[in-house]
């Protein structure tokens, strides 16, 4: 197996980082005082813009225990890949692709019915281009590239539009799951109430039987 550091970064389960050795119980006990000292030092060094590197070099091990700030460039690297801080789906034009469906307005961005209509239009266009591709292949097979590219563009637009629809799909799936759980809990409550009623009726029947037996006159002996 290769010992290339790049392979370790992009592997599924990379080894722990080297600074994990600083996460000791002793350092955790020193961390609160170090944070206070570092904050006070930052206030003192901020006006004159002095360099406090010497102190940080002495206690640099405790810096690894402090969570890093949010990245300023809206990107971060994890497992060898670059991720966006804000999970936002880029539009097709920014990726250099042709967008066939119309852009959603502010009112349409939350109205997912228009996305369903656009999906139906794209599906019809896909079927039409597929039939045209079959016709081109039967007449002049060398002219298939343009139709294949059109089909590819339509499929990319369908896939992108489906990704825009996923937030609504997730909410609806969550609503359905909660409704199923609610109905299941209601069914359990109904069954518990039914069993409680049966137990209550049984106890009432036993009490009536005992009461009737105690009130009956004793039989006279001959």
Swiss-Prot record:
GO terms for cellular component: core mediator complex; mediator complex; nucleus. InterPro entries: Med7/Med21-like, Mediatior_Med7, Mediatior_Med7_sf. Keywords: Activator, Nucleus, Transcription, Transcription regulation. GO terms for molecular function: transcription coactivator activity. Residues 34-55 are annotated as: Disordered. Gene3D superfamilies: 6.10.140.1520, 6.10.140.200. The keyword Transcription applies. Component of the Mediator complex, a coactivator involved in the regulated transcription of nearly all RNA polymerase II-dependent genes. Mediator functions as a bridge to convey information from gene-specific regulatory proteins to the basal RNA polymerase II transcription machinery. The Mediator complex, having a compact conformation in its free form, is recruited to promoters by direct interactions with regulatory proteins and serves for the assembly of a functional preinitiation complex with RNA polymerase II and the general transcription factors. Present with 7598 molecules/cell in log phase SD medium. Component of the Mediator complex, which is composed of at least 21 subunits that form three structurally distinct submodules. The Mediator head module contains MED6, MED8, MED11, SRB4/MED17, SRB5/MED18, ROX3/MED19, SRB2/MED20 and SRB6/MED22, the middle module contains MED1, MED4, NUT1/MED5, MED7, CSE2/MED9, NUT2/MED10, SRB7/MED21 and SOH1/MED31, and the tail module contains MED2, PGD1/MED3, RGR1/MED14, GAL11/MED15 and SIN4/MED16. The head and the middle modules interact directly with RNA polymerase II, whereas the elongated tail module interacts with gene-specific regulatory proteins. Belongs to the Mediator complex subunit 7 family. This is Mediator of RNA polymerase II transcription subunit 7.
């Amino acid at each position: 197996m290769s010992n290339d550091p790049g392979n370790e970064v992009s592997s599924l389960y990379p080894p722990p980082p080297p600074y994990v050795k600083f996460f000791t119980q002793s350092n955790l006990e020193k961390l609160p005082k170090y944070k206070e000292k570092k904050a006070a030092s930052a206030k003192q060094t901020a006006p004159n813009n002095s360099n406090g590197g010497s102190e940080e070099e002495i206690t640099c091990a405790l810096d690894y225990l402090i969570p890093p700030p949010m990245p300023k460039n809206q990107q971060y690297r994890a497992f060898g890949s670059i991720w966006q801080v804000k999970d936002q789906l880029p539009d097709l034009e920014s990726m250099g692709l042709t967008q066939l469906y119309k852009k959603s307005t502010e009112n349409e961005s939350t109205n997912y019915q228009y996305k369903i209509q656009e999906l139906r239009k794209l599906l019809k266009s896909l079927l039409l281009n597929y039939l045209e591709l079959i016709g081109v292949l039967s007449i002049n097979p060398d002219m298939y590239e343009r139709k294949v590219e059109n089909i590819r563009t339509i499929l990319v637009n369908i896939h992108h539009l489906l990704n825009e629809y996923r937030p609504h799909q997730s909410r609806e799936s969550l609503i359905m799951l909660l409704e199923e759980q609610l109905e299941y809990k209601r069914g359990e409550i109904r069954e518990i109430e039914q069993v409680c009623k049966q137990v209550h009726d049984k106890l009432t029947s036993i009490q009536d039987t005992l009461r009737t037996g105690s009130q009956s006159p004793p039989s006279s002996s001959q």
